[in-house]
């Protein structure tokens, strides 16, 4: 009789085995047939070979098997036979409708996860990826997944000669807000050692930001993405974040100077460097280096974007020069024209834009060959229809 209170399916069976008191081994095979029968098999190993007539018949054994069912499973047949060394036991079980014990499902691997970052930028680095036996997990006595859950492979086998290395991170700046929630930043430089070959640029971020929190203001908290306050042409320009000054790297400063020099030709005010924009640009530049495509970020919000790709190791100043050259084809009489052939130029000189952040990624594509991906982010964004005339000013003869 079925009893709903049972939560464990109980099997009773006879074993033909050599009774030595050892724990019963796990079933090696579990099959669910189409007629509602479940068959399980296992091999009972013996410590030494014996003649078949030396194998006594064991007393009746009873074994509990787990189940998520609330019904009782009934054993209908128990077969076994012996050879000289082992006993091969097969248990055949019939399951009434609703007995969860008979819903056998073997485990299957999930998809491989993403590769971890390489443990070294050159020499003998390694990276790994993993997967889990959860798609689905084994249930009802089903088999575990076959194979390994982790793979490890070599990466960045190139020589370290001429490859740059990062300095230690500098100190975190003070919080950009004197109370509640703000942002702080720190930087490092590719000077330990500096690269001596074009493809030797350091990989990764030269700066990072984090949310900071202070107390003292009895007002609602808000997040500030305060930008840098920068002198546009000074070779010693610095970024102001709260009360602490963080110097730009030489390449960041050169990039900012190149932007502001071109903007001055068109009567646009100088830009300020923004670490948050630069971080966003760096994330997308790394994505482009992986896909080796040049396309705008489809998820960008409230930021303008200029893109640059080239064979070889180039710098931001090269990209700015290329973007500015688009201006020779710009039609100053068309206030509603957004032209892909000149959109980098118009964003570069857009009068109402006030902040910029740029990232450069140099990707090794083959031995001795690299590609450069440069992404610039701007805010407020430019290239707004109906606003070109007031934001893209025709240069005067004196400015040319």
Swiss-Prot record:
What cellular component terms from Gene Ontology apply here?
A: extracellular region
Protein's UniProt name: Ectin
Its localization reads:
Secreted
Q: In which tissues is it expressed?
A: Component of the acid-insoluble and acid-soluble organic matrix of the aragonitic skeleton (at protein level).
What SUPFAM superfamilies would the database entry show?
Answer: PR-1-like, TSP-1 type 1 repeat
Q: Which UniProt keywords apply?
A: Disulfide bond, Repeat, Secreted, Signal
What does UniProt give as the signal peptide span? Answer: 1-21
Q: Which domain of life is it from?
A: Eukaryota
Q: Which Gene3D superfamilies match?
A: CAP, Thrombospondin type-1 (TSP1) repeat
What species is given as this protein's source? Acropora millepora
Q: Which PROSITE patterns match?
A: TSP1 (PS50092)
> Which positions are tagged coiled coil?
none
**Disulphide bridges:** 118-155, 122-160, 133-145, 175-212, 179-217, 190-202
Q: Where are the transmembrane segments?
A: none
- Annotated SCP domain residues: 256-362
Q: Identify the residues that the record assigns to the TSP type-1 domain, covering every copy.
A: 106-161, 163-218
